[in-house]
Amino acid sequence: MHIIMKTILATLCLILCASCCSKGACETRIKHTFSEKKFQKYSPVPKHPLSEQTHLYAKSCSIELEQTQLPTSTLTRYVSSTPTDSLSSKPLAAVYVLSHPLIQHKASLLRNKNTKSKIFRECLKEISLGVCYEATRDLALKNISIQTPLMQAECPHLTGTKIVVIPVLRAGLGMVDGFLALVPNAKVGLIGMSRNHETFQPSSYCCKLPEDIADCHVFIVDPMLATGGSASATIQLVKEHGAKNITLLNVLAVPEGIERIQKDHPDVTIYVASLDEKLNESAYILPGLGDAGDRLCGTSNPS
């Protein structure tokens, strides 16, 4: 019992520390539209309980991001190669960008090519905890009666929503411990995706999912959202097994990957720690952090 109490208190301290350090930071909710060629200023979306919202501007398939606390280059303007009339007409899912100073600091440590695997793993775990914290803030609660050491009290308690975290192998494994630190009772699935380095097309080589996944809130974790091909294929595979409530958690993403997920799966919400500029000719994120799987496992030069 003492061990459990210590674990809970340690987790709460981490959350309180993160909340205190987020003063003055900002979060952005992104929505795409692909209609007018003129810039259109959107009214702030309903306030998400983290901090102040920013304004979003969209131009056809291009988007520009303005933030009060961060440089405007957080998300660069881009033009999609996808024809406007072929994009989904359904409402596009929200994308939440975390701009917490501690997360941004640790993301910079991940980017540094001189960061060793041990520190890389620790930072990835800590960032994942922060992203999980934001992604789970809408979980349903109900009041239950409990006996404290002093009195009987009605206290909020999770309603019993089943949660599954699914890492995309192998880099996604580095995000699991951070997620489980906050949601220790979550089930863990596994999906392995490999990418053809010439065509950049994904293929699945492993799929181990809970039998009751249709009744679960599924959180897919993968550090990198580059072309979006692997993430889209993973989401599709999970849906084929019956999952309906899916959230995607990433550390780094680029506009191309976000657009791909919003086009293929407009019902999936994305939480990302940091937005990068673009992809290079090899479909690697720039400035990025290199190959997250290699750096996590120490299997190659991080450059």
Swiss-Prot record:
Xref: InterPro entries: PRibTrfase_dom, PRTase-like, Upp_B, UPRTase/APRTase, Ura_phspho_trans
Co-factor binding details: Binds 1 Mg(2+) ion per subunit. The magnesium is bound as Mg-PRPP.
Cofactor dependence: Mg(2+)
Region (Unknown): 1-86
Residues holding 5-phospho-alpha-D-ribose 1-diphosphate: 170, 195, 222-230, 291
UniProt entry tagged with the keyword Transcription: no
GO molecular function, one term: uracil phosphoribosyltransferase activity
UniProtKB keywords: Allosteric enzyme, Glycosyltransferase, GTP-binding, Magnesium, Nucleotide-binding, Transferase
Catalytic activities: UMP + diphosphate = 5-phospho-alpha-D-ribose 1-diphosphate + uracil
Pfam families xref list: UPRTase
Biological or metabolic pathway of the protein: Pyrimidine metabolism; UMP biosynthesis via salvage pathway; UMP from uracil: step 1/1
Residues binding uracil, per UniProt: 285, 290-292
CDD domains, A to Z: PRTases_typeI
Stretches the record annotates as UPRTase: 87-303
EC number: 2.4.2.9
Regulation (activators, inhibitors): Allosterically activated by GTP.
Protein's GO biological process: UMP salvage; uracil salvage
EC main group: transferase
PANTHER family in alphabetical order: ADENINE PHOSPHORIBOSYLTRANSFERASE (PTHR32315), URACIL PHOSPHORIBOSYLTRANSFERASE, CHLOROPLASTIC (PTHR32315:SF4)
Protein family (similarity comment): Belongs to the UPRTase family.
Role description: Catalyzes the conversion of uracil and 5-phospho-alpha-D-ribose 1-diphosphate (PRPP) to UMP and diphosphate.
UniProt name for this protein: Uracil phosphoribosyltransferase
Species, as recorded: Chlamydia muridarum (strain MoPn / Nigg)
